Structures are given as structure tokens and as C-alpha cells.
Amino acid sequence: MNPTQKPEPVYDMVILGASGFTGKYVVREALKFLQTPSSSPLKSLALAGRNPTRLTQSLEWAARPNPPPSSVAILTADTSDPDSLRRLCTQTKLILNCVGPFRIHGDPVVSACADSGCDYLDISGEPEFMERMEANYHDRAEETGSLIVSACGFDSIPAELGLLFNAKQWVSPSVPNQIEAYLSLESDKKIAGNFGTYESAVLGVANAEKLKELRRSRPRRPRPTICGPPAKGPTLENQKTIGLWALKLPSADAVVVRRTLTTLTEKPHGLPGINESPEQIQKREAFWSSIKPAHFGVKITSKSLFGIFRYVTLGVSLGLLSKFSFGRWLLLKFPSVFSLGWFQKKGPSEEEVESATFKMWFIGRGYSEESLASQGETKPDLEIITRISGPEIGYITTPITLVQCGLIVLGQRESLVKGGVYTPGIVFGSTDIQQRLEDNGISFELISKIKTQG
């Protein structure tokens, strides 16, 4: 072999952080597709992390009730050891990164992938991290052919695909003005979120100013052309169409969707693949030509005002205490207190996870004819409601979306962009990702399409 030639990867996929609370669920999901069916692109799998014993225990847990597959390798890697990450990248085609908070642990992994040409997916929901990775590593990843995509978990696959699914319903001459997502979390049992998710939220609020500084330092990008100005909706509303109270949510989803729409403005036909067939090019261009951009926002919902009060309490606690070190110490020391029981260090039980579900409603408002949008004070006269439903968000839906994105990267790499740092919507939107999710328990529905009084 030429000494300058990149060695052939030993593994198709490595799950980094496989012994973590989310990581073990990702392992369980990946095992479903390891050499099954025979056409699966996942032929070889390895688990990576700091502690081989814990990785082995994670594999045993994920394989239950079957014995753990002997073909799954256990590799040692540490985000604080760049050499171990570089070695990891030479051994695999794709890394699924489950090690958070990503603003602390993610940069070295992305750097190693961008330098080596290894593909990378993660489950980050941290806007500052994601935009910093784009700023720091996009050019290098383009050069080496490393495809780097964050937010491939519940943040932000449902929001991205939900927006695209709703946008596709606006058949010409109709155009959307605004699409709002309403997230409803349901469970038969009281379920506590994982501490890692909570820690990421605390650090995200604490570093909000750094995100503003990063954006100010970056070149201005073109904004999508949207028919009509954004509607000025209330912060709190009684959403009678779906029978829920709703509160505006400053989420990563809205940030990721806006980045996707910005990229689409720059590349109206999507991202050209490495070696697409004429049929694949036609399919991609037709898909993106059908997507009309809209103002987008996310709201969290509850059946009662008391539930909304709990969200407000959590938001106020994060906003007030995350800004200084002692406040962050309090938030991270006593997560159950400041989140009113929503987050705890030990995470939910398997029974609690199995009992939970989500619904994400997408209420689109726009115009039955594009010409109406330019008529001054004319209000939207068309409403389209779609919905995505699925299992628990953090430990069932997130592994499903991450693994399916990974399988697309492994099985359809020639039809994807060569390299760069991108959002999941622009990379996977025109693939068969929606059908894959539907095949794995996440449904997409058109609920209604009605004319309203403008």
C-alpha cells in the first residue's frame, strides 16, 4: 500500500460513548440492523469509549435476551486524547457520537473526523456547538470528504422532516407563510429526563452570548424569500385546534431548521452527491423544488396551565442561574429541584421509557395563491396541519433517527454530498429517510387542509 494512502476502515460504524445512558440505547437499535437483513449496509460494528468494562456491559444490556454478538469490537477512545480519536477515525467509515455535552467533548471528535475524512453524525441539540463546528471545520471537511452532521436525534430530525413534510403539502399556487411546531410529550408514568440533556441545556444558556459573538463574526448569508412577514403570535396561547396550551420554546430545532432553509436558499436544488445517477439527480431536484420556505418556530404544550407553569419555572431557573458559576453549580448539583422533578442524575427506568410517546403538530398558515401575499394587509387564508408521532424522544426515537441516518450514510454514500458540515434536513431530506422512520414506528400524517377567512 502507498504510505500516503488512507488505510481501509475495519468497521462500518463506531458508536462513541456507547456506555452512556443514551449510548446503550443507540447500541440496542444498531444491533437490529447488524447484518440483518442481508442487504443491510451495516456489516461490522464497534463500540468505543474510555472504559472497556462498561462498554462490554452496555453491549450485554443492548443484546438482551440474546448473547452479545462476538463480532462487535470494543475499542478504547477518549475525547481528551486526540491520538486515540485519530486512531479511531482510521478504523471506521462512520462515527456516531453520543458523548455530551458536545460543547465540552464534541470538538476533538469533529476535528479528528474532518482531518481524516471519516464521516460523523451526532445527537447534539446545542446550537453554539453546531455553528462553531461549521465555522471551524466546514472547509477542511469539504477537502477531505468528511460528512459531518449534528442534530441527528430528536433534536432535530422530527422538526426538520416535519417542516419539510408540511411544506410539501403547499402545492402551487398556494404558499406557506408560517409553520409552527407544537410538541406534546405524553406518558402513562412519571418520566425523568437524563441528566446529560439537562446539563447541555444549562451550558447552552450559559454560553448564549458566545453564540451571538460567533454569528457576528461570520459572513452574512442570504435569507430565504418567504411570502409575507412573520405573524406576531402570543408567547402563551390556548391552541384550540389541538386542544392544548402552548408556550414559545427557544429550541435548537428552530435554529437548525433556519440553517437548513438558508443552505437551500444558496443551493435551491439541494446538495449534489458524489456520484449520482441521472434518476437520483432528477429526484433530488424535484424534491427540493417542491419545498417552499416558511417562518418557523417551536412551542411546548401541556393539557393544563399547571404544566405550562412547570416549563416557565424551569426556564426562569435556567435563565437566572446559568449566567454565573455558583448558579450553574446549584443547577447541576440539584437537577430534580430546579426542574421540578423532570430531570435527575440517574435517568428514567426502562419501564418509564417504554411508557412515553410524543406528538409534534405542524400548523402551517399561508395563502391559497401567492399573489395574495403581496396585497398589503391580506391575512393568510389557508391552513395545513400535519403531525409526526412516535415513541419516547430521548432513548427510543433518538436512537431510531440516528441509526437510520447512519444506515443512509453507509448505504447511499455516493448519492450524498462529498463532505462538509451540514444540517440533517439538507443532507437527508431528499433521501428515503421519512419512509425509513415510518418503517420503524414514527408516523407522518396529513391532518387537515382548510380554507380560512383571510
UniProtKB/Swiss-Prot annotation:
In-chain residues carrying the UniProt-annotated modification N-acetylmethionine: M1
Q: Does the keyword Metal-binding apply?
A: no
The compartments listed are: Mitochondrion membrane
Q: Is Mitochondrion given among the entry's keywords?
A: yes
Q: What is its EC number?
A: 1.-.-.-
Which coarse location class describes where this protein primarily resides?
Answer: mitochondrion
What GO annotations for molecular function exist for this entry?
A: oxidoreductase activity
Cellular compartments per GO CC: chloroplast envelope; mitochondrial membrane; mitochondrion; plant-type vacuole; plasma membrane; plastid
Q: Which PANTHER family match?
A: SACCHAROPINE DEHYDROGENASE-LIKE OXIDOREDUCTASE
- The protein's name in its UniProt record: Probable mitochondrial saccharopine dehydrogenase-like oxidoreductase At5g39410
**Which species does this protein come from?**
Arabidopsis thaliana (Mouse-ear cress)
